[in-house]
Amino acid sequence: EITKAHETAILGQLDAPAPENTGDTAPGTARDAGDSAARAYAARYVHAFGAEALSGLRIGVYQHSSVARDIMADVVTALGGTALPLARSETFIPVDTEAVDPATRDQLAAWCRDHRLDALISTDGDADRPMVTDATGRIVPGDVLGPLTARMLGAHEVCTPVSSNTM
């Protein structure tokens, strides 16, 4: 979390001139480092699950304004699936993956139906809370998704918050 001092410093930069963008992608530049990190991130999933793990599957990627919107599609593709980006936004869209409103649930189901998706994935804005649906657009709750992930990873014990109530 940021402190009030951090917030003040951030706000102080709002009126500062933007640095010149040279478009330089030479080795060692920030963009090159970001591309390298993205490739390494996707490779980690390929190493864990194999390059054909999602072969033949159509996965919707509800992108909205999530910071993970591009990397999610990249990982699906790296795992052999077909990623279908949906609803990308350049303005902030608040998404609470644990309290999805009825209109959004209806939209998720419509995308799954209309695009013949096998699943749909997303995250909240800062990508620390995933969202997964089945082929009908029904959301797999986080307190179910966590133990499923733990099982896949071979965990023998799982601790969940007291608010985990759909298990």
Report each predicted region and the residues it spans.
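Conserved residues at beta->alpha junctions
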Residues: 63, 124, 162
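Solvent-exposed alpha-helices and their adjacent loops that cap or buttress functional pockets
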Residues: 49-54, 111-115, 123-124, 131-133, ...
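Gly/Ser/Thr-enriched, mixed-charge loops and adjacent short helices
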Residues: 1-113
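Short glycine-aspartate micro-motif
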Residues: 118-122, 158-159
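Short Gly/Thr/Asp-enriched flexible loops that form oxyanion-binding sites at enzyme active sites
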Residues: 1, 72-73, 129-146
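Flexible loop/turn segments at secondary-structure boundaries
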Residues: 68-69, 128-130, 166-167
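Proline/glycine-rich low-complexity loops and linkers
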Residues: 16-36, 136-167
